[in-house]
Amino acid sequence: MAVKNPFGFTTGPVTFWLIVVYAAFLIPLVWIHESVPAVPSSSKNPYPQLNVTEAWHDLTHITRKYHPYNSRANDEVGAYFMKRIEEILVRNKVEYTKEKDAGGVIWPQEAYDAPAPAKRDVQRRDSKGPAVTIFDDTISNTTYLGTSGSFNQAGAYGTYFEGTNKLVYIRGTLDEDGEWWNGKRDPRKIGQGGVLVNAHYDSVSSGYGATDDGMGCVSILQILNHYTSPGHQPMRGIVLLLNNGEEDGLYGAKVYHYSPLYYFTTSFVNLEGAGAGGRAILFRTTDLEVTKGYEGAPHPFGSVVAADGFKLGAIRSETDYKVWTESYGQRGLDIAFYRPRARYHTNQDDTRHASQESLWHMLSNSLAAVDNLQHTTGYFSGSRNDGDKKKVASGSGTDGVWFDMFGTGFAILELRGLFAWTLTLLIVSPLVLALVTYILSRKDKYYFFSRKVTADEDDEPVSVGGWKGFFRFPFALVLSASITVLSAFLIRRVNPHIIYSSPYAVWAMTLSLFFLVFWTIAKGASVVRPSALQRGYAHIWLFVISWVILVAVTAAADRFKIASGYPFAFFHSAVFVSALISLCDLFALPSKQEFARNAHNDQQTRDNISEVPNSDALISSRHSHVEDDVAEEPTETTPLRSGENGNGNNGTIRTTFATTYRRSLSAIMRTPDEEENKETEQQPYDHEQQWSANLPSWTWFFQLLLLAPITITVFLQIALFIVSAIHSAAADGNDPILVYAAIAAFSIIILLPATPFIHRASFYLPLFLLLVFFVTLIYNLVAFPFSAENRLKVRFQQTLDLDANTSVISITGLEKYTRKMIAELPSGAGQPVNCTPGYGLTSDCRYNGAAVMPNLPQFTHALPANVSKGRYANLVTVNISRSDSSSKLEFGIDAAESKVCNLAFDTPVSFNVRGSAGIDPIFSRPTEQGVRMLTLWRRDASIPWVVDVEPIKTKAVPAGVLAKSSDSDAGAVHEDLRVRKSAELSGTIACQWSDANVLGTIPAFDEALQFSPDWIAVTKASVGLVEGRKKFRA
């Protein structure tokens, strides 16, 4: 009994290997995506100086309270970090100093040209001086102008911010001696430049900040412990920055411009949290050389797709990375948590919902990046390509492509390398296939696109069936892809937000549906018109499609520096080799002439048989075998006369001949020796073309191994990242149609490797997928889209009219669900709710908040709602006085226990905040008619702002003359341009309160957390949870 080929192109092996190969890659990739590597034991820890237990303890301490910049808890967290920094240095017995004047440096607006970088092979002695210097910034401030701000106001605006950053300088062996930052105000290159490691220690007012950005902060403490341990002094100096004020406008990074270390740091690693756990992804990098620093990460995770998403504007969330690169010109990496977004900026961004594994992932990967950067000299110093002298002299980098493989390997190549690869494929792959096609044609073995062939000129043409199966693949692909996309759009229309909590249910539906529809069409066509060329034609179509896509990928890489098309380079490479195998299969076939000749001979034999006078003529004329033949036993149908056929047919061959003698044409023509080998001869599969019997039946397996693994790996990793990053974007007002379209598209791409072989799959596989499809379809259509683990985010703010002593509560979110939430709140039940369109799909729903008036810090106990109108009279004070000039006004502004106020003027003004460093030349943009909005931040809530304000009216006012300038002639220019105006100045002041740590301070927020459904998450709508507004007039 013959053993079946386990790799044969038949139903059993094809079904088995399709399941095995897809399961072998889909399951691990999903597992890697959903899990986080375990913290290694002490014996296996690649960085023994990193103490995850200690870091976790620090994290639990700083996340006990909400700690936004505008809160008392924020000051406590800053003090805790200063205490921990000194404890680590004392423990490691490190010589350190503390700088009192840690900021306020005003740099020239144009830097000097940086000297050429030092030669890498030059030996120099170790830098001398204190090993560590601590900078506690309590004096820096920045003032800048623009056209949009943290309050999303329209028109020109001004911002004044006071910094409270904490910096630690770790001396490198290549750094200059001593305290080189003292007494130097020229921005020349210091040594080989330094590495900046940044994280922000403020949280949002509605979240504890465990991953945003507590893990980044405690990672910095452990990095400090690593580099201050004996034997670990870095080569290039390292600056550890714990900045404050990131959440409401990247202010902490912006005020770093006034640090004495500003021009020293030329490369950076930014640690951020845009999610609430999981793995920390390499979000983006500036160039190839910097990315190589991440190459040694123990568990690399990320690809260039995220960076291109920022570049194209598809991802709008910004981090301090934007300041370091766009404003300062540094080169570095952005490492951040990005999922689950449903917990981001909510009270579930805490240690209960985080893990030590996530902390270890960020900590170990970031230290690996920092370590590689501090060892790298010569790349991150020198003149810039853009020639911008306001920016750091960080040299220039190369565009790159990068991606991880299974969370363990990391691949990097130059973008021009990708361009060369794709361009080579575009040229070489069709030429190679054309060459093989030419050789096959010369050998007369190119069966594709061949209808008929003749052996000789006088013979009738023989059908080859070379066109059978040509149109099946595009028809099946278009129809199955269309139905798959339509199913995703159906879910979007009926239950659009199910993707929020159940993305894998949508994945299962689209994957099963595409396979099911494609199998039905391909299998049906194969049954009706069997063709041995169906697999080959599928490869030809795949080659054409991937080649066309690769043209776009190549153009994007060359013209727009977009590297995200790299998966299609892999895909086309695999398709090219697989298509080449399909062509090479034809070399095993007889030539078409030979096939036609054999077919013609067989036909002649059939004709001769049909013309014989009686059955005796059927006896072979080969006399050497006649004697061996044994006469058949007579039966009832045996003729009475030997010369007569049964049934009185008079020698005519009828259809009953085959039934009577059961002897085929091949049996008649075979010798007994040939008859013995009959069972071993290859036969065409299931009525396919006769010539296909000689096609290799095992090459399909190698084609599957070429196509499936690489396609699944590169595309599924990207698909899982994209869907995880945007599947909950509906809470931000974005239409989820993009998520559904992405899932449908990636489902099609992931299953494309199976399409050339799908018609040989067993009926039971699509039958099972049919069940999967119906179950997931019903679930996706009827299930409630949110859950306690995947909460819908709504945005909260309470607005006080301090003049009228009234309150309005605003809940912003998806209107259908926001109304359900408000109906369950004690203060909102039964009240009229007015909803107006907000951003995207969201609505701003408002109701009267008189029942839950805030008990702001000056009140020690709750007051009844019907108190006198002066309840909040002294909450915000604005004292306005005129100076000697008839148009110049002095504003004295204070707000009880608030660090931020916003002034909205009815007419454009120029302004100067007392004690400011002047207009920042980096962040300011020229304004045409002054500013109408002014945002003021202060580090000490007990010190009022004093602002000089003057109404102006001019056609064009340069940015530098709207406020105090460090240039001596700025005042004269200002006098020349302004138009004095003695009329009254009016407007509105709005101050913010963000501290909800004491229960009862903001009762409306407390009840939103307590009484909302468990599928609702409450986050901040603006800087403050409470905004108090009042009018002013001078």
Curated annotation (Swiss-Prot):
Pfam families: Peptidase_M28 (PF04389), PFF1_C (PF22250), PFF1_TM (PF22251). The chain crosses the membrane at residues 12-32, 419-439, 471-491, 498-518, 537-557, 568-588, 704-724, 737-757, 763-783. Residues 33-418, 492-497, 558-567, 725-736, 784-1034 are vacuolar. The keyword Cell wall biogenesis/degradation does not apply. One of its GO terms (molecular function) is metal ion binding. Gene3D superfamilies: Zn peptidases. Keywords: Glycoprotein, Hydrolase, Membrane, Metal-binding, Metalloprotease, Protease, Transmembrane, Transmembrane helix, Vacuole, Zinc. Binds 2 Zn(2+) ions per subunit. Residues 623-653 are annotated as: Disordered. The active site is at E246 (proton acceptor). Belongs to the peptidase M28 family. This is Vacuolar membrane protease. It comes from Colletotrichum graminicola (strain M1.001 / M2 / FGSC 10212).
